[in-house]
Amino acid sequence: MSQHVKSPEPTESPKPRQKPGAACEECRRRKLRCDRRQPQCRLCEASGVECQVITARPSRGPKPALEGALLQQSTTNFSGPTDDHPLDTPMLDDQIDLSGWQLPVMDDESSLNGVYAASKANSSSGTIMTNAGSGVNSISPPHRSSSIPVELTMPDVGSHIKGMENVEDICEPKISDLIQADLDQLYFDRIHHFMPIQHQSCYFSWRRQPIKTEAQSCLQYAIWTLGASVSALHENIGHSFYQYARRGLEALDSKNMSLASTDLEQVQAWLLLAIHEFMSVDFRRGWISAGRAFRLIQLNWLHGTDGWDLTRAQTDWIETEQKRRTFWMAYCLDRFMSMRTGSPPTFSERVAIRLPCPEANFQNDQPILMGFLSDALAADTSITSTFTECIVVATISGRALSHRNQCLAGDLYFSAVDDFWNRHQWINAILTQRMEAFSAKYPLDMQQQTDPMLLFISLMWRTIILHLYQTMACVIPSHDEKRDLVTEYKKRSSAAAQEIVDLTNKLSHLNSLKVHPLTPIPLSLCVEFLILYHKPGDVFTKQLQDITEAMRNLKRFSNLGQEVLQLFDDQLLTTSPFQSSTVH
């Protein structure tokens, strides 16, 4: 039986990945794929910039004429051998003593800066000026005369440095008025509720001005950075805003200014960039940026007391209230991040700064006299805003952290066990009182459904319980007479862990772009607790799976939980018992 072999059918050539034609300059600058649409691509149309396409570009590669000129020049320079440098003798043989070379030795960073400054000023002569002002030839050993031209032995350092600076310069992003308004609205709709430090009327009054201070310009782009980060439509342009804002803030920090000249907008911009970096860059970068804001606050905001005068001009009250809110936002960020890292907080809770007023009073320019933090911690105090609730839970978080650090250093300072129990009962009493007051004002269904800020605060309350139990379990020995209290608190921590899992399951019903940006912090601490105390097949195992699944769903919007997720994955792959370690 004859077999018929079918000839292979011609296959269509794969479609090219890019459309024909050249990409526009804006897409090339941003390293994005251009759709090559005419007369404007979609990116340029959305950004409001001119769509410019350059088709005639200079040819690249080696240039024969230039190579010939360089070869002729080098031949001319080496055509006449001198007595000091015969052609058959290497320039750097074993008989040349290199120890006598007069190369500049850099003792510190200031010397290096001086050398670079001198090199730019003397690049035409090919010498480097030391601090003493003596010219040192680039590579000429002592007592020898070189016939090699300086132009070949010492490149133009100044021109190289200038070229690098030009490459690193970041142009101010240009966007249309429509996109600007959209980014402002996104910020106040999705970010301001978590960071209520901006007075909207004041912001828009200076934002629309053609001339702004450097600090205001940095704050504007920091706001747009966060606005773009919570928008699926504009997230591709947020990085250019971030780079421009950060470069401007670094330039401001490098200026030699007096201690009392820090602008409010400069501190606010650093805080906003820190939040963005925690979410989208990495923890270390965000922690350093937050530290810059903390130091600026410490320089000139914590001196004196917050007075009783409500008769000052309206603009003065608004600025003072913005400073209060900016400080308390930094205070909360400081304590929540310290809970994650285990490091001591930067700010003390004993500050003479009044609590922020209700949001309605703030935005409507209605001055009201608020109390201090000690007043809000009292058992019978009714708290008027979720921002103040956040400050209270941050304060108790800091006390729990300080309690643990004192226990770890107890052997060095001969701390007695009685001191531990006194501190624990003091913290636990205020924790129970404020947690009950919070639950009475905001029922559980309200915490789960309407307000991501309330959900975050509720998670933090229960995380403090887990934190206190871990401290007890590590410090109290098994033969202690109060070991029964440890067992009782373990039951309370198990219930708190289950409540955290229940609250976490509600995250799937929320828009991920509206979730509190620091939500991975309590979730990470809960995962560490469950990893430490779970046994295969027990109830903690199911809780661990649920909470890690929720964290994976938030992975796209926040980088804060990456390390603990990796820790969980490593735990699944290993059969050795888990040993606790600090995860940053």
From Swiss-Prot:
The keyword DNA-binding applies. Induction: Deletion of the conserved eukaryotic csnE deneddylase subunit of the COP9 signalosome leading to defect in protein degradation results in the activation of the silenced dba gene cluster. Expression is controlled by the transcription factor flbB. Residues 24-51 bind DNA. It holds the Pfam family Fungal_trans. It is found in: Nucleus. Keywords: DNA-binding, Metal-binding, Nucleus, Transcription, Transcription regulation, Zinc. Residues 1-24 are annotated as: Disordered. SMART domains: Fungal_trans, GAL4. It comes from the Eukaryota. One of its GO terms (biological process) is DNA-templated transcription. One of its GO terms (molecular function) is DNA-binding transcription factor activity, RNA polymerase II-specific. Its main location: nucleus. Transmembrane segments: none annotated. The keyword Ion transport does not apply. InterPro entries: TF_fung (IPR050815), Transcription_factor_dom_fun (IPR007219), Zn2-C6_fun-type_DNA-bd_sf (IPR036864), Zn2Cys6_DnaBD (IPR001138). GO terms for cellular component: nucleus. Residues 1-15 have a biased composition (Basic and acidic residues). Transcription factor that regulates the expression of the gene cluster that mediates the biosynthesis of the antibiotic 2,4- dihydroxy-3-methyl-6-(2-oxopropyl)benzaldehyde (DHMBA) and its derivatives. Probably binds the conserved motif 5'-CT/CCG/AGA/CG/CT/A/CA/TT/A/GC-3' found in all dba cluster promoters and that shows significant similarities to the binding sites of other fungal C6 finger domain transcription factors. This is C6 finger domain transcription factor dbaA. It comes from Emericella nidulans (strain FGSC A4 / ATCC 38163 / CBS 112.46 / NRRL 194 / M139). The gene is dbaA.
